[in-house]
């Protein structure tokens, strides 16, 4: 994967600001939460970009593309790397297609492989290890992902989970699977809606 030659930072930043504002307005009009795009907060998106830049992961997995706001920022953080593999999953084809359009509009369409698939199915069939995994999907299914996530993480791998402060009760059992596992060192960060970071230290 690589950054398309048409990428321009000023355009990217203004585009992301516009996308967040537009989708937030859309979300505010949706009664059913499942119809909302529910992007990460801008400060969380910037944090993801910083982690991607610092860590320089060669293999990245995002679970929960939605319409691509966090996807854009992860791709932004990866943009200086010569070679990497970034996969973003979503079960909703229309949202994945919207994300594809946003990536094209910002010159980052060559940076991400968008896959429409259930995360549980993907994780259970996956044989790869990822340096960075970002999880921001339907929280009710997180516990189903535990085994697949452990398999996809190795020493030095980083797992980041969104909404761990705003929706603490919904994710506490899932997070405990990592905080109580001696193979990981974990932190909860007061960034945006709350980010959880687990870094694998042992096999």
Where are these regions (language model features)?
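A short alpha-helical cap/connector motif
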Residues: 1-132, 139-160, 165-203
């Amino acid at each position: 994967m690589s950054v398309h030659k048409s990428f321009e930072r000023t355009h990217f930043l203004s585009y992301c600001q516009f996308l967040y504002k537009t989708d937030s307005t859309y979300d505010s009009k949706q009664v059913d939460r499942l119809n909302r795009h529910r992007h990460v907060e801008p400060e969380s998106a910037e944090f993801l970009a910083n982690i991607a830049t610092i860590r320089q992961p060669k293999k990245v997995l995002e679970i929960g593309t939605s319409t691509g706001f966090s996807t854009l920022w992860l791709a932004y953080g990866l943009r200086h790397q010569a070679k990497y593999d970034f996969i973003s999953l979503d079960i909703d084809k229309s949202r994945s297609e919207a994300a594809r359009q946003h990536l094209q509009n910002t010159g980052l369409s060559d940076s991400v492989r968008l896959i429409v698939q259930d995360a549980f199915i993907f994780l259970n069939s996956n044989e790869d290890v990822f340096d960075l995994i970002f999880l921001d999907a339907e929280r009710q299914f997180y516990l189903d992902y535990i085994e697949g996530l452990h398999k996809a993480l190795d020493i030095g791998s980083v797992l980041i989970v969104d909404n761990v402060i705003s929706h603490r009760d919904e994710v506490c059992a899932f997070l405990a699977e990592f905080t109580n596992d001696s193979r990981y060192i974990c932190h909860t960060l007061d960034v945006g809606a709350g980010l959880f970071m687990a870094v694998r230290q042992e096999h």
